[in-house]
């Protein structure tokens, strides 16, 4: 039985939205959810355009993740000139200085890590997000990002190394 496009949306919309939310980062803007929803719609519009040519035995989930990743990378390129990384770092530093050292320390650490992940190169950010937040294995990541499994592993390794160094520098 062939999968209908509507079924594909029902099965994967929330998962793709969550992936894009994590990949794009929630920078505290009120309209961040709207931006991610718009990007999710773009993913499914692109998927609809090529759905008829998709082989029935294809991995639909990986195919959607690949489209989502490409849409996110396109969005990153569009936003690059608008986003000032220095202001993000300054804002993170101010948040860290004003944070209390009581029970909110775990939440503060999560915010620091989230800010650092958002500052990673796009491919490393995608690999870390797919591996640790979406819980995908390296073959799936490689398929989604059109790279080798070794390339996916290397990007995750480099990202983790970068995050560790940045966290050590903050201490």
Task: Provide a role label for each language-model segment.
Residues 82-106, 137-140:
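Internal acidic/polar
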Residues 55, 66-87, 106:
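Arg/Lys-rich amphipathic alpha helix in sigma70-family domain 2
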Residues 26, 42-59, 78-80:
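Sigma70-family region 2
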Residues 69, 145-169:
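DNA-recognition helix of helix-turn-helix
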Residues 38-45, 58-70:
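Structural recognition of an alpha-helix C-terminal capping motif at a helix-to-coil junction
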Residues 1-25, 34-37, 48:
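A short, charge-rich alpha-helical start-of-domain segment used by transcription regulators
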Residues 13, 17, 44, 121, ...:
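C-terminal flanking helix
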Residues 127-131:
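A short pre-motif secondary-structure segment
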């Amino acid at each position: 039985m062939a999968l209908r496009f509507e079924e594909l949306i029902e099965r994967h919309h929330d998962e793709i939205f969550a992936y894009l939310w994590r990949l794009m980062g929630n920078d505290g803007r009120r309209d961040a959810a709207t931006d991610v929803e718009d990007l999710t719609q773009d993913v499914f519009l692109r998927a609809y355009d090529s759905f008829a040519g998709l082989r029935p035995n294809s991995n639909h989930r990986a195919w959607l993740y690949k489209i989502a990743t490409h849409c996110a990378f396109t969005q990153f390129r569009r936003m690059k000139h608008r986003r000032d990384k220095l202001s993000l770092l300054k804002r993170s530093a101010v948040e860290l200085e004003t944070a209390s050292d009581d029970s909110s320390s775990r939440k503060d650490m999560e915010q620091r890590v989230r800010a650092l992940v958002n500052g990673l190169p796009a491919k490393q950010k995608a690999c870390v997000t797919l591996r640790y937040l979406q819980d995908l294995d390296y073959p799936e990541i490689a398929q989604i990002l059109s790279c080798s499994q070794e390339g996916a592993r290397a990007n995750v390794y480099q990202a983790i190394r970068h995050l560790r160094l940045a966290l050590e520098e903050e201490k």
